[in-house]
C-alpha cells in the first residue's frame, strides 16, 4: 500500500490519534450499546455515520446549500449558544428501551419527548418512594419548549480571554491543502482552515426518521439578543469541535451555519469542573454509597431489561442465590475466593476516569460505582463525572432512519469511527483501528510501507525524510525511526568470523558478498573482500614479497588486481597505502566500493545527484545493496534495488530488472502505436519528432536538437568534451541526462577523474556543467508563470500521483519566444574575410609525481661502547693537618675492576688458549644444561672421594663439594625444573629391559644406581622447604647446610622420591616389549589374536600408528598381560603409571585423545578398573603410603583441569576425595548442590585482615549419626572439623574454588537448588564454547567407581588424609 492511494480528505495522517473525552470507555467495545450525553449545552457528540468519500463531500457554506439537501440536518438537533456563536450539537442516536418506546419523566420540566415513532406516549408519573433519587437528570437537560417559563442559565464566560479555533485531527499538524484557485469565498463561509485541516474535516451528517421533529433552540447568552429559529438547522459538529468555555464572546455576529473547528486540546479542557466559578449543579447527586438494591430498582424502573451482576475478575454472571465474596471497603463482587485473591494482587496501573478520561491522581476523591447497561463497576474522579456519566447512559438514543448508513469496519464488522480507508482494486475498505488495519494487510497479503520492528504504518510526508532502510539477510528492511532501527540491530546482532582473516565482527558492521553460486559471505573490510575475489578468480600465483614494503608475506596474505596485474600484500595497512598511489603511469580511477585502482571504462551509478564509479558490475551491485539504493519500479510498482534508469518521453524512470524494462517498453509502444521510436542520439523511447536520411538509411530523432547534435558527431565536427578537439569521437556516454563524446578511452578516463576536481579554465567538468543553465531551464518571469498556470492541464498519470508528490501547479512547456532575425550580412569580395582562424585550447593537467626512497630505521652497525678502565695513580693533596676546621677527605672502599698484566712466556700462553677451547667444548651454551652437567660432575667427584658411603649427607660434609652445591643452587626455587630436565634428558626410548618397579622400588635402599642421584636430590622434600620458609628472615641466612644435615640425620627410610615427573619412556618401552614378545614366535593362534568384528587385528609397535579400535583393544590386552622383564607381574599402580605415560606420549605427539575418558576406549577403561579395584596402598615402616602415581603426573598428562567435561568432573572428584576425605562411591553420591557451598570470610593474619574463599561441605545428618554413636555424641558433632577446600592463591590454575565455580557455570541453572545430585553426565554433543556442558541426568554409580579407583591410586590422597586437621580461621 502507498499513502497516495488514500483520498485526500481521508489521509491517515489527518485522523485523530486519541479518543476524545466522552467517547467510548476503555473497557467497552463497539458491539455494546452506546448512549450519548444530554446533560449540558457545552457538550455534543456526533453519532457514528458513514464516512463520506472524497467525491461526495461538499462544504456547506450558505443556507442555500441546506435547502438543496434538507435531509442533511434532519433529526432532533439542539442549538447551543456560547459567546455569541451559534452551532448545532447533534442528538445522540436512539436506544431501544422496549417495544413501547417509553419516555423519561422530569418533575421540573413539563416537556414531553417523542418516542421512536414520533408520537407522544402516555406520561408515567415518578415513583414517590424514590425520594430525591427519583429525580431523573434528563429533565433539567432537555431542550425547552418555546412557551416554557423555565430557562437555562448559560455558563459565565470571562471577557479577557480570546476565542481560539483549531482542528482536532490526528497527527497531521504539518499538512495543508489549499482551496482551488478561482473559487470565491462566501462572506458567510467559515474562516480558513488552519494548518492540517483538509476539505470535509469533521463534517458528518446524521439523519433520523422523517417523523422526528427537532426541539427548539435555547436562547443565547443574555445581552446578545441572538436566538435561533426552529426551522434553521445549522450543520452539526462533533464534540471535538466545541469552543473553549473560558473564551469571551466575539463582537461580530456569526451565522449559525458556520463551521467552527475546535482543537483536541480545547475539547479536553471543556470538561465541567466543580471548582470553576460558573459551575451549576444541574441536579441532585446520587450518593456513591447507594445500596445495590435501590440502584437495581431504579434501573429496573427505567429499563425493562434487568441488570446482571458479574464477577469483577472473571466477568462470570452471578446467579440468584449464589454466594458472593467482597473485600471490606471495596464495592467489587467476586464469584469465588480465588478470584478475590487474584484481583487483589493485580498491579495498580494508571487509573483514568470513565467519563472525562483523565488520570486519577487523588484516589481519596475517586468514586467507584456500578452503573451502565452492563452493570459493571466504573471509577470516576469526582461525583460530578459519575452524575454526568449516568445521565449519558440514561438518555435514549434515537435510531437512525437508514441502518445502511452506519459505517462498519470491514474486518471486525463494528460500527464506529473510520481510522483507515484502503482502496484495494475497485473496493474501498474502511477500517476502525490499527489492529484491523494489520489484520487486513495480513489477510490480503499486502506489502505496505510498515515498520519491520514495531509493525506501525510509516506515513510518508512531503518534505520529511523517508524511512530508515537496512539491507539484512537479502531483504530490504524499513523502520519508522532510528529507535526501531537500533532495536532491530540489537535484537538481530550476531558475531561472525571474517571469511578471509577470521576476525570476529558484528554482522551489521561487515560487508556481504554474493558469489556466482548465490552463497553470501561476510567480510570485515574491503581489503578482505577484494582479496577473496582475487583468490576465487584463481589469479593469486606463487607467493612474492609484499608489493608495498617488500617484506615476506604472512598468513593470510592480501591481494588486489589492477589492470590484469595481481599485487600481493602482507597486511591490510600495506593494502590501503598502496591504493593511495598509482602503481604505474597513466590515469587510474578509484572504485567507490572496493577502492581499488583501475584504468578501464567504469561502471557508473547516478543516485541522489551523485555519480559513483565502480571497477566492475559486481562492485556496483554490492554498493547498491550496502547503501540501500532502492526505488519504486515503474512497471511492477514495488520497491526494489535499482537496476537501470531509462528515459521515456523526456521523463526518467527507474526499473528493478531487465524483464520489467522489456515489459514496460512493450506497454509503452502499444500506447503510442506506430509513432513510437527510439531516438538515435539520446536513446530515449518517445514519439517520432524528426526523420533524417543519411547514406541510404533512415534515422529517427525525438527533436531537432538531437538531430543537429547527431549530425555534428556523424560528420566528425563535434568536439571532445575532454580535450576540445574535433575529429572522430569513439567514446560516448550518458552523463546526468546529457550525451558526452570523447576521442578515446584516455580522454574518457580524464573526464571521470576530474569530476570532483574540475579545471574550469580548460574544460567543463561535471560540476561546472551543472552550473551552466540550458535555455530551457532559465527562470520564468512572474507574468509568464501566471499566464501558464491558468492554462495548466494535468494528465491522468499526474492526477494519480498527487498523493505522492507535493501539491503544486505544473506549467506546460511552451516554446521560447524566437529571437529577432539578425540583419543580413553585407557581401564582401575580400578573400581575407573567407579565412577562418584555427582556434585551439591548450589544457594543462598537473599531476603529483610520487618518488619512493628507502630509509633505514634499524641499527645495522654494532654499537661502540666506551669502557673506562680505571688506573690507580697517586695525587698529592695538600692538607692543613687538622689545624683548622676544613673538610677532611674520607676513604671508602669501592670494588673497582683493575686489569692486571702478568708476565708469561710463549709456551704458557699456548696452554692457556688450549684450556679455554676445552672449556668452550665442555660447557654448553644453554645455562640449564650447564647446571645439569655440573651436578653430574659433582656427584661423580663425590663418589670418588668417598667410596664407602653413597649418601648425599657425606657429600655435603665434604668441604670441597660444599661450594659446588651452593653454586648450583640445587635447593633453590628452580630445583624441580632442573630435576625434570635431567629426567627427560635421561629418557631413552630404545633402552632395552627398562623396569619401572626396579627403578622405583618400595625400599629406598634398592634404588637403581643409574637414577640414584635423582632420588638423592629429592631427600629434601617440599615440607622441609616450607619449614625453612616459615623461619624468620634473620635465621634463614646460612641455614641451608643445617636443614640438609638435619634431614640427612633421619632414618634413610623416612622419605621417598617426590615430584620426579612422569617419564613416558617406561610406558612406551613396555608397550614395545609387550608387542614384540606377543609376536616373537610368529603368528599367534586364532584363539589368542585380537579381533575387531570378523577381521583379525594385529597390534603395531608404534602407538601413534594404531587406530582408535586397535589402541582400545590393545591397551585392554596390555593391562591383562604386561609383565616385568624378569617375568613377574606388575602391580596395579605401576600399570596405571605405564598407561599415564602412554597418554602423555600421545599428547606430546599431537594425538589429541584421552584414553581414560573417551567412549572409544571403554574396553580399556573397564579392564584397568578391574586391576585397580583390588589394589590396596602399601604402608611403609614410617607409616607413610607408597604409590608410584603422583598428583603431578595427572596434571602433566591432562587428567586434571578443564580440558573437557569428563576431565573437569575428574578434577572435582579428585579435590573432593583429597580434601573432604570421601573414599567410597556412596559418600560421593551424598554430595549435592545444597550441601556443597562457596563461602567467603575474613580472617586475621600477622600481615593483616584478608578475605579467604573456600568450599565447605556439610555432611548429611544420617552420616554424622552413623559415625557418632554413644554418649557425648552432641559434643563430638559440635567439635567435628568442618570439611572445606580453600583457594590456592599461589597457583590459581589449580585452585579448587575456581574449578567449582566453573563447574556451576556449565551446569543447568534449574539443578543448582537440588539436594540429591552433584555429579552430572556431560552432554553428548558439546564443545568448549557451549554455554552448558552437562545434562540433567546424574552420573551412574559404575562410572563414579571407575573414576574413584583411579583417584585412590594417587599418593597425595593418603598424605592429605594423614595430616591433622587445621584449626578453623573463623
UniProtKB/Swiss-Prot annotation:
The keyword Kinase is annotated on this UniProt entry: no
Tissue: Most abundant in brain, moderate in muscle and heart, low in other tissues except placenta.
Molecular function GO labels: DNA binding; zinc ion binding
Biased composition (Low complexity): 1-12, 52-61
Outcome recorded upon mutating residue 398 to S: In XLID112; uncertain significance
Record note on what altering residue 454 to R does: In XLID112; uncertain significance
Protein name: Zinc finger MYM-type protein 3
Originating species: Homo sapiens (Human)
Amino acid at each position: 500500500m502507498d499513502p497516495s492511494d488514500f483520498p485526500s480528505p481521508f489521509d491517515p495522517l489527518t485522523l485523530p490519534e486519541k479518543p476524545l473525552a466522552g467517547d467510548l470507555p476503555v473497557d467497552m467495545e463497539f458491539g455494546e450499546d452506546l448512549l450519548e450525553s444530554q446533560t449540558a449545552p457545552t457538550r455534543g457528540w456526533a453519532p457514528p455515520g458513514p464516512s463520506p468519500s472524497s467525491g461526495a463531500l461538499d462544504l456547506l457554506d450558505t443556507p442555500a446549500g441546506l435547502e438543496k439537501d434538507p435531509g442533511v440536518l434532519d433529526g432532533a438537533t439542539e442549538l447551543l449558544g456560547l459567546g455569541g456563536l451559534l452551532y448545532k450539537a447533534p442528538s445522540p442516536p436512539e436506544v431501544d428501551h422496549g417495544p413501547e418506546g417509553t419516555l423519561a419523566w422530569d418533575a421540573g420540566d413539563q416537556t414531553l419527548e417523542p418516542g421512536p415513532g414520533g408520537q407522544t406516549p402516555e406520561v408515567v408519573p415518578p415513583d414517590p418512594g424514590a425520594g430525591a433519587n427519583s429525580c431523573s437528570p434528563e429533565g433539567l437537560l432537555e431542550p425547552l419548549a418555546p412557551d416554557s417559563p423555565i430557562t437555562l442559565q448559560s455558563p459565565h464566560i470571562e471577557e479577557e480571554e480570546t476565542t481560539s479555533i483549531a482542528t482536532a485531527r490526528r497527527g497531521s499538524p504539518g499538512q495543508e491543502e489549499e482551496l482551488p484557485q478561482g473559487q470565491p469565498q462566501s462572506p458567510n463561509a467559515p474562516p480558513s482552515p488552519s494548518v492540517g485541516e483538509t476539505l470535509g474535516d469533521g463534517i458528518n451528517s446524521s439523519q433520523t426518521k422523517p417523523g422526528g421533529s427537532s426541539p427548539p433552540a435555547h436562547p443565547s447568552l443574555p445581552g446578545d439578543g441572538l436566538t435561533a429559529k426552529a426551522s434553521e438547522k445549522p450543520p452539526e459538529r462533533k464534540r471535538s469541535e466545541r469552543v473553549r468555555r473560558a473564551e469571551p464572546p466575539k463582537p461580530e455576529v456569526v451565522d449559525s451555519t458556520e463551521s467552527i473547528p475546535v482543537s483536541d486540546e480545547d475539547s479536553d479542557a471543556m470538561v465541567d469542573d466543580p471548582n470553576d466559578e460558573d459551575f451549576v449543579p444541574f441536579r441532585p447527586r446520587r450518593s456513591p454509597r447507594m445500596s445495590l438494591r435501590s440502584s437495581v430498582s431504579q434501573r429496573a424502573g427505567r429499563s425493562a431489561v434487568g441488570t446482571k451482576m458479574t464477577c469483577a475478575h472473571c466477568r462470570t454472571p452471578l446467579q440468584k442465590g449464589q454466594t458472593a465474596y467482597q473485600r471490606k471497603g471495596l464495592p467489587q463482587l467476586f464469584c469465588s475466593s480465588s478470584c478475590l485473591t487474584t484481583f487483589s494482587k493485580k498491579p495498580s496501573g494508571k487509573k483514568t476516569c470513565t467519563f472525562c478520561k483523565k488520570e486519577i491522581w487523588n484516589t481519596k476523591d475517586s468514586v467507584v460505582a456500578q452503573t451502565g447497561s452492563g452493570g459493571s463497576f466504573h471509577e470516576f474522579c469526582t461525583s460530578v463525572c459519575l452524575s454526568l456519566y449516568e445521565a449519558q447512559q440514561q438518555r435514549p438514543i434515537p435510531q437512525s432512519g437508514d441502518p445502511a448508513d452506519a459505517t462498519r469496519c470491514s474486518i471486525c464488522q463494528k460500527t464506529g469511527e473510520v481510522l483507515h480507508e484502503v482502496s484495494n482494486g475497485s473496493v474501498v475498505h474502511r477500517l476502525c483501528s490499527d489492529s484491523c488495519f494489520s489484520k487486513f494487510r495480513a489477510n490480503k497479503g499486502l506489502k505496505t510501507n510498515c515498520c519491520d520492528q514495531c509493525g506501525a504504518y510509516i506515513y510518508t510526508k512531503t518534505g520529511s525524510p523517508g524511512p530508515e532502510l537496512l539491507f539484512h539477510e537479502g531483504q530490504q528492511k524499513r523502520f519508522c525511526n532510528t529507535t526501531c532501527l537500533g532495536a532491530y540491530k540489537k535484537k538481530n546482532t550476531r558475531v561472525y568470523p571474517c571469511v578471509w582473516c577470521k576476525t570476529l565482527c558484528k554482522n551489521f558492521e561487515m560487508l556481504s558478498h554474493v558469489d556466482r553460486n548465490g552463497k553470501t559471505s561476510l567480510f570485515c573490510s574491503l581489503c578482505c573482500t577484494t582479496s577473496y575475489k582475487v583468490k576465487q578468480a584463481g589469479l593469486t600465483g606463487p607467493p612474492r614479497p609484499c608489493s608495498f614494503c617488500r617484506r615476506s608475506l604472512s598468513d593470510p596474505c592480501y591481494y588486489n588486481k589492477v589492470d590484469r596485474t595481481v599485487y600481493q600484500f602482507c597486511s591490510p595497512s600495506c593494502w590501503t597505502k598502496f591504493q593511495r598511489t598509482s602503481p604505474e603511469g597513466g590515469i587510474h580511477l578509484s572504485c567507490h566500493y572496493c577502492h581499488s585502482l583501475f584504468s578501464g571504462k567504469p561502471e557508473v551509478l547516478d543516485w541522489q545527484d551523485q555519480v559513483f564509479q565502480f571497477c566492475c558490475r559486481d562492485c556496483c551491485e554490492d554498493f547498491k545493496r550496502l547503501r540501500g539504493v532502492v526505488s519504486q519500479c515503474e512497471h511492477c510498482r514495488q520497491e526494489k534495488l535499482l537496476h537501470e534508469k531509462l528515459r521515456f518521453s523526456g521523463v526518467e524512470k527507474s526499473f528493478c530488472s531487465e524483464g520489467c524494462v522489456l515489459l514496460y517498453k512493450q506497454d509503452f509502444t502499444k500506447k503510442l502505436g506506430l509513432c513510437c521510436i527510439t531516438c538515435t542520439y539520446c536513446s530515449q523511447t518517445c514519439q517520432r519528432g524528426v526523420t533524417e536520411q543519411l547514406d541510404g538509411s533512415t534515422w529517427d530523432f525525438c527533436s531537432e536538437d538531437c538531430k543537429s547534435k547527431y549530425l555534428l558527431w556523424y560528420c566528425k565536427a563535434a568536439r571532445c568534451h575532454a580535450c576540445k578537439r574535433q575529429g572522430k569521437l569513439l567514446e560516448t556516454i550518458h552523463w546526468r541526462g546529457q550525451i558526452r563524446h570523447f576521442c578515446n578511452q584516455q580522454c574518457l578516463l580524464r573526464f571521470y577523474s576530474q569530476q570532483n576536481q574540475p579545471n574550469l579554465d580548460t574544460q567543463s567538468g561535471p560540476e561546472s556543467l551543472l552550473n551552466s543553465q540550458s535555455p530551457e531551464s532559465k527562470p520564468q518571469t512572474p507574468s509568464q508563470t501566471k499566464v501558464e498556470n491558468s492554462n495548466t492541464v494535468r494528465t491522468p498519470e499526474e492526477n494519480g500521483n498527487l498523493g505522492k508528490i507535493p501539491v503544486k501547479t505544473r506549467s506546460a512547456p511552451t516554446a521560447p519566444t524566437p529571437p529577432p532575425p539578425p540583419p543580413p550580412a553585407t557581401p564582401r569580395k575580400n578573400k581575407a574575410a573567407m579565412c577562418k582562424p584555427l582556434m585551439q585550447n591548450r589544457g594543462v593537467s598537473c599531476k603529483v609525481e610520487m618518488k619512493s626512497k628507502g630509509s633505514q630505521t634499524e641499527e645495522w652497525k654494532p654499537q661502540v661502547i666506551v669502557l673506562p678502565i680505571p688506573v690507580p695513580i697517586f695525587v698529592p693533596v695538600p692538607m692543613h693537618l687538622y689545624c683548622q676546621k676544613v673538610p677532611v677527605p674520607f676513604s671508602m672502599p669501592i670494588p673497582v675492576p683493575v686489569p692486571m698484566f702478568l708476565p708469561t712466556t710463549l709456551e704458557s700462553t699456548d696452554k692457556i688458549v688450549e684450556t679455554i677451547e676445552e672449556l668452550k667444548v665442555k660447557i654448553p651454551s644453554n645455562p640449564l644444561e650447564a647446571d645439569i652437567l655440573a651436578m653430574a660432575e659433582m656427584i661423580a667427584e663425590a663418589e670418588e672421594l668417598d667410596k664407602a658411603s653413597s649418601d648425599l649427607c657425606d657429600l655435603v660434609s665434604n668441604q670441597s663439594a660444599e661450594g659446588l652445591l651452593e653454586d648450583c643452587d640445587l635447593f633453590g626455587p628452580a630445583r624441580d625444573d632442573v630435576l625434570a630436565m635431567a629426567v627427560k634428558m635421561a629418557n631413552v626410548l630404545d633402552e632395552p629391559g627398562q623396569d619401572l618397579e626396579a627403578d622405583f622400588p618400595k625400599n629406598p635402599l634398592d634404588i637403581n644406581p643409574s637414577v640414584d642421584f635423582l632420588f638423592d636430590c629429592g631427600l629434601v622434600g617440599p615440607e622441609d622447604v616450607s619449614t625453612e620458609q616459615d623461619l624468620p628472615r634473620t635465621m634463614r641466612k646460612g641455614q641451608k647446610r643445617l636443614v640438609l644435615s638435619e634431614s640427612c640425620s633421619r632414618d634413610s627410610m623416612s622419605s621417598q622420591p617426590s615430584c620426579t615427573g612422569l617419564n613416558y619412556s617406561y610406558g612406551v618401552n613396555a608397550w614395545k616389549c609387550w608387542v614384540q614378545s606377543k609376536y616373537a614366535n610368529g603368528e599367534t593362534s586364532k584363539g589368542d589374536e585380537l579381533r575387531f568384528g570378523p577381521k583379525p587385528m594385529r597390534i603395531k609397535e608404534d602407538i601413534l600408528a594404531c587406530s582408535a579400535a586397535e589402541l582400545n583393544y590393545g591397551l585392554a590386552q596390555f593391562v591383562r598381560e604386561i609383565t616385568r622383564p624378569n617375568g613377574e607381574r606388575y602391580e596395579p599402580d605401576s600399570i596405571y603409571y605405564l598407561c599415564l605415560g602412554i597418554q602423555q606420549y600421545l599428547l606430546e605427539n599431537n594425538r589429541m585423545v584421552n584414553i581414560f575418558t573417551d567412549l572409544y576406549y571403554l574396553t580399556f577403561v573397564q579392564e584397568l578398573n578391574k586391576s585397580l579395584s583390588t589394589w590396596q596402598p602399601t604402608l611403609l615402616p614410617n607409616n607413610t603410603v607408597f604409590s608410584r602415581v603422583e598428583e603431578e603426573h595427572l596434571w602433566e598428562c591432562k587428567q586434571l583441569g578443564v580440558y573437557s567435561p569428563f576431565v573437569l568432573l575428574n578434577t572435582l572428584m579428585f579435590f573432593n576425595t583429597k580434601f573432604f576425605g570421601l573414599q567410597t562411591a556412596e559418600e560421593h553420591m551424598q554430595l549435592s548442590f545444597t550441601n556443597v557451598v562457596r563461602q567467603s570470610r575474613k580472617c586475621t593474619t600477622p600481615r593483616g585482615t584478608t578475605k579467604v574463599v573456600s568450599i565447605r561441605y556439610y555432611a548429611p545428618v544420617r552420616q554424622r549419626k552413623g559415625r557418632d554413636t554413644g554418649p557425648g555424641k552432641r559434643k563430638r558433632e559440635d567439635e567435628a572439623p568442618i570439611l572445606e577446600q580453600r583457594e590456592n592463591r599461589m597457583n590459581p590454575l589449580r585452585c579448587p574454588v575456581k574449578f567449582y565455580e566453573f563447574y556451576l557455570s556449565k551446569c543447568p541453572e534449574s539443578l543448582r537448588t537440588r539436594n540429591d545430585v552433584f555429579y552430572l553426565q556431560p552432554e553428548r554433543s558439546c564443545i568448549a564454547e557451549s554455554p552448558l556442558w552437562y545434562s540433567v541426568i546424574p552420573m551412574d554409580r559404575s562410572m563414579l567407581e571407575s573414576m574413584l579407583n583411579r583417584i585412590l591410586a594417587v599418593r597425595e590422597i593418603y598424605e592429605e588424609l594423614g595430616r591433622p586437621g587445621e584449626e578453623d580461621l573463623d
